[in-house]
Amino acid sequence: MFEFITDEDERGQVGIGTLIVFIAMVLVAAIAAGVLINTAGFLQSKGSATGEEASAQVSNRINIVSAYGNVNNEEVDYVNLTVRQAAGADNINLSKSTIQWIGPDKATTLTHANAADKTTLGEEFNTTSIKGNNDNVLVQQSDRIKVIMYAGGVSSKLGAGDEVQLTVTTQYGSKTTYWANVPESLKDKNAVKL
């Protein structure tokens, strides 16, 4: 009923073959585990980076506090925005921001002007500090910076009833949109709320 193997050579060969198969399986399992651990670490770091970028785009925004236009010969020649940090935002450098201008007769993207002369703006905008110590960077939520755009340099000056969509994109990629609406009458005005 039971068979006994008495030959020592055969018994050793079967044991070595089994041992080789076992070692091969352990090596394959170890390599697979290493690949899985590396992949999991890579995916975790990618997920973390994506989460941080998404968080920055949502939280590192600006708020537009007010907007007004300078009136010259019954046309708005300068559009001025007063901006501040949104709640919970990091420092926002407006010199690294862009403004998309979609106006009555032209759409373009404005970049920050490097010129010290704020009156010669073309398709650029400039900034000046209202409250705070920096003309370009919003450091605290109490800081206020005026963003100046020359409508005549972008396209034509804005007339009564015109509308401009302004979208400010910060260096983090967050966007804030403001609709500047020129009042129906500009007669005898020096400045108007937009």
From Swiss-Prot:
The keyword Glycoprotein applies. It comes from Halobacterium salinarum (strain ATCC 700922 / JCM 11081 / NRC-1). GO terms for molecular function: structural molecule activity. GO terms for cellular component: archaeal-type flagellum. It is found in: Archaeal flagellum. Keywords: Archaeal flagellum, Glycoprotein. The lineage of its organism: Archaea, Methanobacteriati, Methanobacteriota, Stenosarchaea group, Halobacteria. InterPro entries: Flagellin/pilin_N_arc, Flagellin_arc. This is Flagellin A2. Its main location: other. Residues 1-12 form a propeptide. Glycosylated. Flagellin is the subunit protein which polymerizes to form the filaments of archaeal flagella. GO terms for biological process: archaeal or bacterial-type flagellum-dependent cell motility. Pfam families: Arch_flagellin. Belongs to the archaeal flagellin family. The gene is flaA2.
